[in-house]
Amino acid sequence: MSHIYSVDEIKAIVAPIAAAHDVDGIYLFGSYARGNATEKSDIDLRVDKGRLTDLFALGALYADLEEGLNKKLDLLTTGSLDQKFLQQISKEEITLYEHATT
């Protein structure tokens, strides 16, 4: 049986991984953000890449997130998204991590 996470549980797992990979932000959208996730739901995340400059670094982030959450992920980068789709998901997004600026 697969676990249905709360947003707080997802944030607790994702935030330290995001910080370790030095991304600018990670945001939850989709069924988990809307509160209607089921056991079969994947976790939809949008990432502002920050210092992730290549596919290997992005792949490492994905692997760490998937291992930490033990769930299938859709990890989308902000730069790869169509503006219309970005506007659509921004209505439901929940911030899981944002890099603190000094």
Task: List the model feature ranges, each with a label.
Residues 42-44:
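Acidic Asp/Glu-based divalent-cation binding sites
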Residues 1-25, 34-39, 50-102:
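Catalytic core of pol beta-like nucleotidyltransferases
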Residues 46-48:
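Short hydrophobic/aromatic beta-strand micro-patches
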